Amino acid sequence: MTAQPQVLKIRRPDDWHIHLRDDDMLKTVVPYTSEFYGRAIVMPNLVPPVTTVAAAIAYRQRIMDAVPAGHDFTPLMTCYLTDSLDPAELERGFNEGVFTAAKLYPANATTNSSHGVTSTDAIMPVLERMEKLGMPLLVHGEVTHAEIDIFDREARFIDTVMEPLRQRLPGLKVVFEHITTKDAAEYVRDGNELLAATITPQHLMFNRNHMLVGGIRPHLYCLPVLKRNIHQQALRELVASGFSRAFLGTDSAPHARHRKEASCGCAGCFNAPTALGSYATVFEEMNALQHFEAFCSLNGPRFYGLPVNESYVELVREETTVVDSIALPNDSLVPFLAGETVRWTMKR
């Protein structure tokens, strides 16, 4: 039997999908990402959303102000697409190196998405400009029609929105974010080099039973919602295969405890403190640690056309108990896997 590795040394990873929020929350959560990641694609769903170059520059500065001394971290900013967005503003931001990508939220699909896009037809001039520029489109892939069951919204999105869009704009670079279904895993796997996907730790580790059986676990509630185990297994098999167009995107989405543990709780898992160890655990369970570094550190830069990070990080096999909560000025944050014992720990 092969001896278990005790240390995993990988190139410094990047997080290709994260929510850093703003104000006190921003100051609290940024260090958990900047300590170990070289770059992160920062979601623009603030209130109001980041829709201009000036807003993105200002937000980027607030993020950098929250990065502790000694951390080597670069936030990559995104533009929030709206029906009224000017293509020229998007192009200027991309050409000036302010916007790395643009984010399509179907209106009301998730937290702070009420300004989102009503239909791809409404933003076709913007999408055509992005295709011409080679600018990546990041997609929250769910339809939002009230009559569509929440567990079916991703699969329906592929058929009714994603595939027609990619047929219409075949040169458009698309990241299908936080995929959660067998349908999406197969769709991305069978796609061409212009289609990639991010996958979160929670969708690899858990399915809807973990969230709903024996009591409801609000800190596993995120959007897209956890699906049944056959979908979880399809995601695990995709990453374990070494598929090169799937990469790390935590979708870490912090909410204060009172907003999660509520009669109408918010969607999102704050997984930044525990994500890398969680991914390592999944890859080890799937006997696929040989593909772990590529998923975390190589596949994303290749798709985005960016250099890989030069430095390295290490995870050590050391059982650690995740803290129950993290202090906020007037509340607390509950991290993903709070109170649980984890197998892999980041070496500081």
Curated annotation (Swiss-Prot):
Modified positions (N6-carboxylysine) are: 103
Q: Which Gene3D superfamilies match?
A: Metal-dependent hydrolases
Annotated cofactor note: Binds 2 Zn(2+) ions per subunit.
The record lists Zn(2+) 2 as bound by 103, 140, 178
Query: Where, in this chain's numbering, is Zn(2+) 1 bound?
Result: 17, 19, 103, 251
- Matching SUPFAM superfamilies, A to Z? Metallo-dependent hydrolases
Q: Which reaction does it catalyse?
A: (S)-dihydroorotate + H2O = N-carbamoyl-L-aspartate + H(+)
Instruction: Report keywords, A-Z.
Output: Hydrolase, Metal-binding, Pyrimidine biosynthesis, Zinc
- What top-level class of enzyme does the UniProt entry assign? hydrolase
E.C. no:
3.5.2.3
Query: GO MF terms on file?
Result: dihydroorotase activity; zinc ion binding
Cellular component aspect of the GO annotation: cytosol
- Which cofactor(s) are needed, names only? Zn(2+)
Work out whether the entry's keyword set contains Hydrolase: yes
Short name of one Pfam family for this protein? Amidohydro_1
Entry annotation: catalytic residues = 251
Q: Which family does it belong to?
A: Belongs to the metallo-dependent hydrolases superfamily. DHOase family. Class II DHOase subfamily.
Subunit structure and binding partners: Homodimer.
What the protein does?
A: Catalyzes the reversible cyclization of carbamoyl aspartate to dihydroorotate.
What name is this protein filed under?
Dihydroorotase
Q: Which organism is it from?
A: Klebsiella pneumoniae (strain 342)
> Lineage of the source organism?
Bacteria, Pseudomonadati, Pseudomonadota, Gammaproteobacteria, Enterobacterales
| Gene name of the encoded protein | pyrC
